[in-house]
Amino acid sequence: MSDLGSEELEEEGENDLGEYEGERNEVGERHGHGKARLPNGDTYEGSYEFGKRHGQGTYKFKNGARYTGDYVKNKKHGQGTFIYPDGSRYEGEWADDQRHGQGVYYYVNNDTYTGEWFNHQRHGQGTYLYAETGSKYVGTWVHGQQEGAAELIHLNHRYQGKFMNKNPVGPGKYVFDIGCEQHGEYRLTDTERGEEEEEEETLVNIVPKWKALNITELALWTPTLSEEQPPPEGQGQEEPQGLTGVGDPSEDIQAEGFEGELEPRGADEDVDTFRQESQENSYDIDQGNLNFDEEPSDLQD
């Protein structure tokens, strides 16, 4: 699942006027409050200005999707709520038909993302809450991906460090509620492949692996945020992650070390801690839905 997808539903164009009931100006343009039923089965009720949707309105797609909020010259702009056919929804700011600014996305599996958006993508500071486990990622996002300084918070411990391409990288630490923290770093390593896999084309699968260094008392964590990333060129679209950004449900990110038991060992031994005992932690479980973009149109007779 994803908060947007590859399919687009377009609003009717200027040549497909449909039926209209409402106010008009002196030159006959739709102006004021009105209702329109479009030839494709979509409907719009709300404010018009000089023949275009402008102000508060509700646009209902024939497949059940619905947008209620602000329009500026036929485009979603300002505050608005978009409800998708699968029941997921976005509530927040829009700019030029894109999720842009502060907003909350409620996924169909009850996960939520709260934070900044840029060109339809999670971008900036944000919090992703995993409903099933109660864990949450709090930190930086770049073009829809977990990237930069962040905390991954679990029930009785948390990981503090940096992420890149949705994976933890470099120095970091695990902080435990019992009053201690373990310092170490995530190193990229090749995963083991079975015999059948080795016979096929050689594909390098790199995963982050935790190497513990030492245990200390609790200390204040001061994240150093990475420099602000430049905005993507053109229209940004967040793809199903695992789909490709969320069209198919997510691409599981499996990093050893987010959950498990702490096993302190001698300083001269390599220690891989927090191994998952049962189910590997996939901490970017985006759910998806279709993206319905409205094509600008001059709705006037």
Swiss-Prot record:
Any one biological process term the GO annotation gives: axoneme assembly
Comp. bias intervals (Acidic residues): 1-20, 249-261, 292-301
Cell compartments where the protein resides: Cytoplasm; Chromosome; Cytoplasm, Cytoskeleton, Cilium axoneme; Cytoplasm, Cytoskeleton, Flagellum axoneme
UniProt xrefs under InterPro entries: MORN
Keyword entries, A-Z: Cell projection, Chromosome, Cilium, Cytoplasm, Cytoskeleton, Flagellum, Meiosis, Repeat
Pfam families reported for this sequence: MORN (PF02493)
Tissue specificity comment: Expressed in the trachea, ependymal cells, oviduct and ependymal cells (at protein level). Germ cell specific. Specifically expressed in testis, and to a lower extent in ovary. Not expressed in somatic tissues.
Residue segments, region Disordered: 1-41, 225-301
Residue stretches of each MORN repeat: 20-43, 44-66, 67-89, 90-112, 113-135, 159-181
Regions of compositional bias (Basic and acidic residues) in chain numbering: 21-31, 262-278
Sequence ranges of Polar residues compositional bias: 279-290
Domain of life: Eukaryota
GO cellular component: 9+2 motile cilium; axoneme; condensed nuclear chromosome; cytoplasm; extracellular region; meiotic spindle; motile cilium; outer dense fiber
Main location: cytoplasm
PANTHER family: RADIAL SPOKE HEAD 1 HOMOLOG
Function according to Swiss-Prot or TrEMBL: Functions as part of axonemal radial spoke complexes that play an important part in the motility of sperm and cilia.
Subunit composition and interactions: Component of the axonemal radial spoke 1 (RS1) and 2 (RS2) complexes, at least composed of spoke head proteins RSPH1, RSPH3, RSPH9 and the cilia-specific component RSPH4A or sperm-specific component RSPH6A, spoke stalk proteins RSPH14, DNAJB13, DYDC1, ROPN1L and NME5, and the RS1 complex-specific anchor protein IQUB. Interacts with RSPH3B. Interacts with RSPH4A. Interacts with RSPH6A.
Listed name of the protein: Radial spoke head 1 homolog
